[in-house]
């Protein structure tokens, strides 16, 4: 399989998927395997993946030996092996990060079938679901959280100076906070009254301070931060007084959402996943019935999907090829119905689960 390696001499046009077959015997093998690889976590496809074939299965084979056959995956997730001999083959999908066509990094996408495929002239198409056993760790940021001239920098999670009623008020820092003095802070409502019983909590990364207070919708607040109220892990501290002014949104700035599902299999433990326009997960909602309702939902355009949550922990879980028994990944099904939420509006959507699946 030459892939895209063959081009014409004058224009450089690619001769796509060119294959050259030859035989050392009197005939050429004519069997084939076709299939598709889908990313289990998103339901999408990835044209950088490969499908690979082995004629034996031991847990270490895919990590230590080169495959017998390799096929590229196209933009629809499809692959095809041609000119195969008769016999049994083990089919895998691989996101080959290091270029060695072996599965030896847990951050690589990987897919496997539970049993071998017996190749003949009528071999059925196969479906594989790829997963990464571990997430790729983000690279450490080389940027500092400030400098000695400016001091410690803080970024509140406000939208145009407003606090989301459905979110916590958070103060974000680029480095973990090592020292914090709440006595050097003061929260004021409507420019006059001091708010008592304000609690500051460090999140698990210590890069955020969560501010807990009895917020009142529609009111204006100011958070006063005196100098040296906080110090990060590099020893950088706030060198001057700071004030964060904001308001809390009102309920009218949200919409209600009602989604009705037809033919939804609740026995499969579906979880509704809501994505922002940039594919960031903004909510996961286990579905115990065929209707989802929220009295307050942030306005915007959203994408939807269903996670079939086998172990009922509320999040997607990858597979495990090396466990006993092997475990396939949980599956996510993208839904073709977009969700548009308008402010101060009853937003309704009906989703037919019997409708044709979304094209990738």
Outline where the language-model segments fall.
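N-terminal targeting or signal-anchor segments and their processing/structural boundaries
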Residues: 1-360
């Amino acid at each position: 399989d030459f892939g895209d390696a063959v081009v014409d001499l004058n224009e450089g046009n690619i001769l796509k998927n060119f294959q050259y077959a030859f035989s050392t015997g009197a005939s050429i093998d004519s069997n084939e395997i076709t299939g598709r690889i889908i990313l289990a976590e998103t339901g999408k496809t990835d044209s950088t993946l490969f499908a690979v074939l082995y004629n034996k299965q031991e847990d270490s084979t895919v990590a230590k030996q080169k495959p017998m056959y390799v096929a590229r995956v196209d933009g629809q997730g499809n692959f095809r092996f041609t000119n195969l001999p008769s016999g049994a083959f083990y089919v895998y999908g691989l996101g080959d990060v290091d270029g060695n066509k072996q599965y030896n990094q847990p951050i690589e996408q990987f897919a496997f079938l539970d049993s071998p495929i017996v190749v003949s002239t009528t071999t059925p198409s196969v479906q594989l679901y790829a997963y990464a056993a571990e997430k790729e760790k983000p690279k450490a940021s080389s940027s500092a959280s400030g400098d000695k001239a400016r001091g410690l920098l803080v970024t509140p999670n406000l939208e145009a100076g407003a606090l989301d009623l459905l979110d916590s008020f958070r103060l974000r820092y680029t480095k973990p906070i090592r020292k914090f003095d709440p006595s050097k802070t003061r929260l004021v409502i409507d420019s006059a009254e001091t708010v008592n019983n304000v609690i500051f909590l460090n999140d698990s990364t210590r890069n955020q301070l969560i501010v807990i207070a009895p917020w009142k919708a529609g009111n204006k607040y100011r958070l006063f931060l005196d100098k040296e109220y906080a110090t990060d892990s590099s020893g950088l501290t706030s060198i001057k007084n700071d004030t964060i002014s904001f308001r809390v949104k009102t309920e009218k700035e949200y919409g209600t959402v009602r989604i009705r599902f037809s033919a939804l299999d609740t026995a499969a433990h579906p979880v509704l996943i809501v994505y922002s326009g940039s594919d960031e997960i903004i909510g996961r909602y286990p579905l115990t019935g065929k209707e989802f309702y929220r009295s307050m939902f942030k306005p915007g355009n959203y994408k939807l999907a269903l996670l079939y949550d086998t172990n009922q922990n509320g999040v997607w879980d990858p597979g495990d090829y090396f466990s006993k028994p092997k475990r396939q990944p949980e599956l996510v099904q993208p839904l073709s119905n977009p969700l548009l939420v308008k402010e101060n509006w009853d937003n309704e959507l009906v989703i037919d689960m019997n409708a044709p699946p979304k094209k990738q």
